[in-house]
Amino acid sequence: MTTFYTVISWLSVFGYWLLIAGVTLRILMKRRAVPSAMAWLLIIYILPLVGIIAYLSFGELHLGKRRAERAKAMWPSTARWLSELKECQHIFANSNSEVATPLFQLCERRQGINGVKGNQLQLLTTTDDTLKALVRDIELARHNIEMVFYIWQPGGLVDQVAESLMAAARRGVHCRLLLDSAGSKQFFRSPYPAMMRNAGIEVVEALKVNVFRMFLRRMDLRQHRKIVLIDNYVAYTGSMNMVDPRFFKQDAGVGQWIDMMARMEGPVATTLGIVYACDWEIETGKRILPPPPDANIMPFEEETGHTIQVIASGPGFPEEMIHQALLTAVYAAREQLIMTTPYFVPSDDLLHAICTAAQRGVDVSIIVPRENDSMMVRWASRAFFTELLNAGVKIYQFEGGLLHSKSVLVDGQLSLVGTVNLDMRSLWLNFEITLVIDDDGFGADLAQVQDDYIARSALLDGERWNKRPLWHRVTERLFYFFSPLL
């Protein structure tokens, strides 16, 4: 009997180390970034079983077999649609400003289409303005309304949006609503899903959270886009979830959330429409390709319209596109670079690009919230401040609430506005969307908003920063080590 237990013990030890070795080899063979690989290896060797379970659940980007098959199956029809869209020559920009040209070239070659011109673009910087404008557009809708949001939380003005959406469905407008399962969990526990479905709205819970499927699909892969499409002509996107900040996370201790959204009219709605169509098909298996732009309803001349490129990321879309776009934008800066983000945990490449821009004389400013709803991100982001300050980057800490806006402005001409945070999850993992706008008029509008953020912020002083307590430094480095996983 003793021999039997000895054999079992040795087999258990052998199996344990074989499992460790197998996962280690898998991490090394994935050719991931060195900091990310080192972080996972440390977790696995310090907390072996927990680390292995965590890696198999969250360490690799896998969409799940069914969704992956749908993503693969939809590409031929999407490619044909893009080919047909290219025949609408009148909507595409043939030239861009000097600072924007490299980024637009990257997008055209990786995504297959140029930026579209002739769009009317409005920057909305308050929740009231955004939700009231959205209600007006929904009330005027005649054919279709499509929405995707990470968070939809009932309360306040959001309920007016829900009521107007249900009224639109009752009068015959085809309404589709795609909401992330994790972000919108309060919505799916409320009476609204049943009410909306009874009104005729197609409500879909995207990327359902299910502990029994954690090894079949990565659970922290989230649908983080915020898109509204109305009649294939009016569109919204930006940083704002479908929440009223007066009713959202009031107990978080960070103040009201501050966001920005872009409202668009014109052919850019078509390119946003194909992104939505891909998301809808991946989640439901149903194909809803948008119609091509109607030349009869494009009243804006090239001279007065905005040129916009849409960048989408996530499984099924060009890999590392968002990351490459940000790097290209930063390296294009010659005079000024202003970035706003609630979560600043950049890749090494992006950090070095920002520091290099400052070191070659570009006026670089980063605006982040002083208080953050994520304790881990709050400490991890501070681990980058010393290197940024030493390079000459100005860091502003926003004190008027949780600054949730995501924007980049390069030389007053090239703007990036959307859902992308400057962290690993947005850069490498989630379904995200970003608008690239080549227009000095819109750049001036964005600069005015960023100046307002700066006026409500405190500039981080380098000398005071260097005198922070030792325990702060230790905590920062601890969370910095796990930054590739945040």
From Swiss-Prot:
GO molecular function: cardiolipin synthase activity
Reaction catalysed by this enzyme: 2 a 1,2-diacyl-sn-glycero-3-phospho-(1'-sn-glycerol) = a cardiolipin + glycerol
Source organism: Yersinia pseudotuberculosis serotype IB (strain PB1/+)
UniProt subcellular location: Cell inner membrane
Alphabetically ordered keywords of this record: Cell inner membrane, Cell membrane, Lipid biosynthesis, Lipid metabolism, Membrane, Phospholipid biosynthesis, Phospholipid metabolism, Repeat, Transferase, Transmembrane, Transmembrane helix
Membrane topology: Multi-pass membrane protein
A UniProt-annotated Pfam family: PLDc_N
Encoding gene (name): clsA
Protein name: Cardiolipin synthase A
HAMAP family on file: Cardiolipin_synth_ClsA
